[in-house]
Amino acid sequence: MSKGPAVGIDLGTTYSCVGVFQHGKVEIIANDQGNRTTPSYVAFTDTERLIGDAAKNQVAMNPTNTVFDAKRLIGRRFDDAVVQSDMKHWPFMVVNDAGRPKVQVEYKGETKSFYPEEVSSMVLTKMKEIAEAYLGKTVTNAVVTVPAYFNDSQRQATKDAGTIAGLNVLRIINEPTAAAIAYGLDKKVGAERNVLIFDLGGGTFDVSILTIEDGIFEVKSTAGDTHLGGEDFDNRMVNHFIAEFKRKHKKDISENKRAVRRLRTACERAKRTLSSSTQASIEIDSLYEGIDFYTSITRARFEELNADLFRGTLDPVEKALRDAKLDKSQIHDIVLVGGSTRIPKIQKLLQDFFNGKELNKSINPDEAVAYGAAVQAAILSGDKSENVQDLLLLDVTPLSLGIETAGGVMTVLIKRNTTIPTKQTQTFTTYSDNQPGVLIQVYEGERAMTKDNNLLGKFELTGIPPAPRGVPQIEVTFDIDANGILNVSAVDKSTGKENKITITNDKGRLSKEDIERMVQEAEKYKAEDEKQRDKVSSKNSLESYAFNMKATVEDEKLQGKINDEDKQKILDKCNEIINWLDKNQTAEKEEFEHQQKELEKVCNPIITKLYQSAGGMPGGMPGGMPGGFPGGGAPPSGGASSGPTIEEVD
């Protein structure tokens, strides 16, 4: 396949989206189910691995082996408070592997464990394949987005996930920055504009303030809540209906995982309906102990169930304004991002907060981030179209960076919301006489004492010549590149001795070897998935052949054209094969093909004889199946070997 353009991927907590910039505009690409967003879900079963819609659709039947929310684990330590509290809510197992979290599942009858990077890489592989199917070309270059909050280790781990998926990640950019780009292309303005981006997605909430002037973006502040989103609104509705079920039927369904799962799916659907209608009905057959649950919910009730959560979205807005030192009257544009911003009540609260100002909803909120990432991908891969040329992008550091000085004090070198790339240098000295070395400990965070901040890494600068305290001069430099990767160096001015560290959070990082191993495993899993698809297709082919052949010889139009002995021969063989199929659903591809050849050996001579005597058979042309068997009876039945297999799962 020829090489395709660079794509933009919004790797979301609950859903992901991919876009490409071509023919002077961005196209958001639909997956094989026709959806423009794909669930960030990976499921493992006895026979196969599923990614995206297929994984999410079977979650009710296979909750413990269906992994989602990998974005909440990526780049974190197992003992991170976030990981510990999230684990309580997940149906899948998270285990501790030398201080790093891994998800543990049953796959093809074995216990397997995967790093979050691997799970995210599976979702990225899916997004890559979606783009390739649409473009008909191989896709390798991509821009991938992350929340403005992500610290260094989370950004780096996301980049690793891209590498494992076989992508060359051109750049990791902040989601609000991407949304701003999507928006910046639509509105060319000369004067400086302050833009507030309100991003309420499936699992997270981010508010960012940017200024745009002459095509240059600058992020002024970011705020938000990593644990607020559409899923929380679903949960409120789920709890409401669990209580209603208790009242109506005196039964508690909350312990029955499958019932709750089915109820949650229905609630998510109802929530979406309530963004356009004032009421929604829910009908679930045999929800619990054979009881059907038919009920409805109004928009007003939904708003009341979530009143505190909806109102709470304004707190980060106020914080972002404070950090950017702006008054709400100074915001020129408000941009909505994330599916949950479709909720009318949220739009109203935000609009009222900004004294009736119109909101920008022109960009589909689910797609805005991928849209901007696609534009950025085009810029970075050297797209020359003028739509793209006038755009420059400045990203920021989400948290302050500094080192620990005497007494455990955090001394900041790079303040949060500093535009990157950036470089800052400061001179330090020794704390005691004849001190032979200094320990440079690098932290990120906003607290005054380092113990309350996050340690990124540390190194020692030794060999300082003996001198009284305060005499040696040690120059410390913090340098952040465009990808947000941090280099810290320390030089002793008198000797020129230097030591440095690249903070890619190695304790949370995968080693080169790990990544390479995972790339190979990803290839292996992909090959297994292919093999499984081929197997199913040869099984379906055999099944269709047997049933169609049976139907053909039993067709009354053939009465008298085929002698009973031949007919019986075919029927016996077909029934034998159908019985074999029932018992051997999981046989190998070769076995299905062998059975098909055996069946053809019996059928082909008889059918050929029929043709010669009848000069072509009534009612059907030869079907396009291996062995070209005739289609039966009235409607010619073609081979169903490669047709879609549709299964309804609640």
From Swiss-Prot:
There is a cross-link at K512 (Glycyl lysine isopeptide (Lys-Gly) (interchain with G-Cter in SUMO2)). Residues 616-636 have a biased composition (Gly residues). ATP binds at residues 12-15, 71, 202-204, 268-275, 339-342. Belongs to the heat shock protein 70 family. This is Heat shock cognate 71 kDa protein. The modification Omega-N-methylarginine is found at R469. It comes from Bos taurus (Bovine). Its EC number is 3.6.4.10. Molecular chaperone implicated in a wide variety of cellular processes, including protection of the proteome from stress, folding and transport of newly synthesized polypeptides, chaperone-mediated autophagy, activation of proteolysis of misfolded proteins, formation and dissociation of protein complexes, and antigen presentation. Plays a pivotal role in the protein quality control system, ensuring the correct folding of proteins, the re-folding of misfolded proteins and controlling the targeting of proteins for subsequent degradation. It catalyses: ATP + H2O = ADP + phosphate + H(+). It is a peripheral membrane protein. The modification N-acetylserine is found at S2. Disulfide bonds: none annotated. Residues 394-509 are annotated as: Substrate-binding domain (SBD). The modification N6-acetyllysine is found at K108, K246, K319, K328, K512, K524, K589, K597, K601.
